[in-house]
Amino acid sequence: MLEARDLHCERDERTLFSGLSFTVDAGEWVQVTGGNGAGKTTLLRLLTGLARPDGGEVYWQGEPLRRVRDSFHRSLLWIGHQPGIKTRLTARENLHFFHPGDGARLPEALAQAGLAGFEDVPVARLSAGQQRRVALARLWLTRAALWVLDEPFTAIDVNGVARLTRRMAAHTAQGGMVILTTHQPLPGAADTVRRLALTGGEAGL
């Protein structure tokens, strides 16, 4: 279980959110919503331990995150707004960098992400959407329980969004957790996703 307790965050003397508390249990996914500058990415960075809140605490499995960073990071898949891939490498080589023991599974993961036939193409030659798919192919390889995804559908077409949404649904059905930001609808998942709205210093589930 991931828990946020009374989180408070300020940026440039402006309160992004205050008194924010919620939990994400096994089998749940949460969509963080809000306008530009509402603090969506900042909240995800707090939840992953990449930044510290100005008040409150994040807990993982009942322990303060700052005390269990190693075990937490073994349980975490974080994909930020930028793909975080190496453009000099091919799609296959990028996945091998993150999952060196899964060589036999890489082609299937890339195919699931819509990159069949592009396995050995340098990422620099791929479109923005294809580069995003390289990063998201990790969803078919990772063994992490908690997925935190910042705008995963950027530059992804409708069919790709549907495929990725099905993968997230399968992950939560198996007891995994997903937290994501997106402005796009989640096809077939509207009834199962909780929404956390950040609105001008306040938040509501």
From Swiss-Prot:
GO terms for biological process: cytochrome complex assembly. ATP binds at G34, G35, N36, G37, A38, G39, K40, T41. Residues 2-205 form the ABC transporter domain. CDD domains: ABC_CcmA_heme_exporter (cd03231). Belongs to the ABC transporter superfamily. CcmA exporter (TC 3.A.1.107) family. The complex is composed of two ATP-binding proteins (CcmA) and two transmembrane proteins (CcmB). This is Cytochrome c biogenesis ATP-binding export protein CcmA 2. It comes from Salmonella paratyphi A (strain ATCC 9150 / SARB42). The lineage of its organism: Bacteria, Pseudomonadati, Pseudomonadota, Gammaproteobacteria, Enterobacterales.
